[in-house]
Structure formats: C-alpha cells, structure tokens
Amino acid sequence: MISSNDFRTGTTIEIDGQVWRVVEFLHVKPGKGSAFVRTKLKSVRNGNVVEKTFRAGESVQQAVLEKSNLQHTYVESGDYVFMDMISFEETRLSSDQIGRGSKYLKEGMEVNVIFYKDKVLEVELPISITLKVTETDPGVKGDTASGGTKPAILETGAQVMVPLFISVGEMIKVDTRNDSYLGRDN
C-alpha cells in the first residue's frame, strides 16, 4: 500500500484491477476542508488518461512491475516468440499483447517487456530503430525543393512517410513512438 501523499510522477498503482501510472499530481490544501491530491493517471494497458482525486493520506494499492529484457527470436503461427536474455526462457506473445509495436519487430531485436502478476502489460520498443526501405515511389530530380513526403514500406511491413529523396534499399531511422522518419542511417 502507498499513501496518496507519497505519489510521484511514474508511480504505478492499482485501482479496480487496472494498473495506472501517475503522470501528474498536485497536493492541494484549501483554506476550508481537508487536503487532497489531484492526479492525472495513465492506464499502462491501453494508454487512456483519467483525472482522479484522492484524499490526503488515502492508501492505495501500489503495483510493483517487473521489467525483463527479451530478444525477439522468431514468429510461429501468429505468435511472436521472445527469449529472456538471462534465463533463456521463451515467452510467446500475440500481436494484440504487443500492440502497434509489432509492425517494427525484427528477429534479434531486444525489447523490454513489463509484467504485472505474471501477465504482460506492455512491450517497450527502442525509441529509434534502423530499418531498410523495401518499397517506395522513385524520387524525381528536383523534388527536394518542395520538401514533400511519400509513403515507404519498410522491411518489417511498417509504412512511414519519408522525404522524396529516399529510395529503395536505403537504411533509415524511424521513431517507434509516432511512426516518423528521423533520418538516414550512416
């Protein structure tokens, strides 16, 4: 149990069977009445953000999360198979459990998997990854002056918008949080 007075940004708590991460908190002590803590909570499972108010000193169940470094080894019948880098145990996850990050997974890629009570809550990909462009429209000389973008399909099947000068076979860096092009990989 944790007191609402001890909330900090990043603290994880459990309310009604769901795990929430404290994004913002504010201790309020009004002139009349008792003090309270106003919080903004983000669901670890689906990313929903809610505002909730707690009485000062109210006890809440703290959620202790386990983080494991796993390596993606292969895909078998729709499941992604990961290997723990320390114990060498295999973990199978569906694309639903991985979420939108499944479109960036390559064999050999290391990810952080967050567990709560032996259930997968979240798969954290590296923020920036390097992938090869497998399909895109050819760039025409002189196109770069307009600063436009075009769609490109990467080796994992993910689609991102890239500048017009990018061609098939180039290695590019992609931000996995918002599917944006970061630059060429040298």
UniProtKB/Swiss-Prot annotation:
InterPro entries: Elong-fact-P_C, NA-bd_OB-fold, Rib_uL2_dom2, Transl_elong_fac_P/YeiP, Transl_elong_KOW-like, Transl_elong_P/YeiP_cen, Transl_elong_P/YeiP_CS, Transl_elongation_fac_P. GO terms for biological process: peptide biosynthetic process. This is Elongation factor P. It comes from the Bacteria. Disulfide bonds: none annotated. It is found in: Cytoplasm. Keywords: Cytoplasm, Elongation factor, Protein biosynthesis. Belongs to the elongation factor P family. The gene is efp. Involved in peptide bond synthesis. Stimulates efficient translation and peptide-bond synthesis on native or reconstituted 70S ribosomes in vitro. Probably functions indirectly by altering the affinity of the ribosome for aminoacyl-tRNA, thus increasing their reactivity as acceptors for peptidyl transferase. GO terms for cellular component: cytoplasm. One of its GO terms (molecular function) is translation elongation factor activity. Pathway: Protein biosynthesis; polypeptide chain elongation. PANTHER family: ELONGATION FACTOR P, ELONGATION FACTOR P (EF-P) FAMILY PROTEIN.
